[in-house]
Amino acid sequence: MGSTLLLWGLVAAASPVAEVICQIATGSVPAWFAWARIGVMAVALPAGYLTAALRPVRGFCAVYGFILAILALLSGYSRARLYLAEYGFIPGMLLLQLQGLVIAFAVLAFAWLRRRSWSGIFLRAGELAAPVRPAWLSVAGPPLRWRLLGPLVGMAGGLCVLGYVRYTGASTADPRQIALWAVLFAAINAFVEEALFRNALVSAVLPDFGARQAILVSTVIFGVGHWNGLPSGSAGVLMTSALGYFAAKAMIETKGMLWPWFMHFVPDVVVFYYWGLGAIGHRSIG
């Protein structure tokens, strides 16, 4: 119990939870805040080697600290806006997605060095027909399997995001210019975010805290991180938290990332499609 409370204390202090609380309380987030979050991990990690009580959080601190550091060094929302404003939607987004792949491969390499196993970081398709746990979810019929639930969650996520973007408004334009680019950007973005917030995080938390905590930690960090993302606000947090929960659960139960990636990919197609239409509408397609 004590180590679990410590884990969640670190999540609260170093994850986007702290950043969102600061933003709501003060109206802005200082530029140094990202480095303060990294500092929390930098202090907790060596402490985990000195004190037996802190040992279970070493994996989380190492992996999440690395994620925070590389994100702070190589990316950021303001830089994303700068790329899109300077180069237009397609070249700007392509540059961002390539940058995302560099980050994802670096994080996966770091996670692999810790586990020395591709399956240990879920970097494989997985057992696509694995049963959904717990068994009571199947009620009285045959076992509910991920080959059914995976596509259903993906399609439901796509419909939810479609409702969100249409409600919040989007420019109208010839969709043929952006459709294939939206698919490409969604495929890359889904892989990048799954690598960071599922493969790396889940594989770091799972050995010491079990499936439930691994799923919840991934869900909270991914979901709250969309407070300023797309979709954003409380609706964005709820939608992405639901996606994050099912994606992390699918990754653990199928022992792979294909279904998590697919569930993420489908709503991302909608996001990038309408984002691109907005760019076209403002004559910034590139």
Question: Which residues fall in each region the model found?
Answer:
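N-terminal, membrane-interfacial amphipathic/helix-forming hydrophobic leader that caps
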Residues: 1-129, 275-286
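Membrane-interface starts of transmembrane alpha-helices
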Residues: 32, 36, 87-98, 181, ...
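Hydrophobic core segments of transmembrane alpha-helices in multi-pass, intramembrane catalytic enzymes
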Residues: 37-44, 103, 181-185, 239-244
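Residue-level signature of transmembrane alpha-helical cores of multipass secondary-active transporters
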Residues: 104, 143-151, 182, 186-187
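Alpha-helical transmembrane segments and their membrane-interface junctions
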Residues: 150-173
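Juxtamembrane helix-entry segments on the extracytoplasmic side of multipass membrane proteins
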Residues: 171-183, 232-234, 238
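Functionally important transmembrane alpha-helices
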Residues: 191, 212-225, 229-286
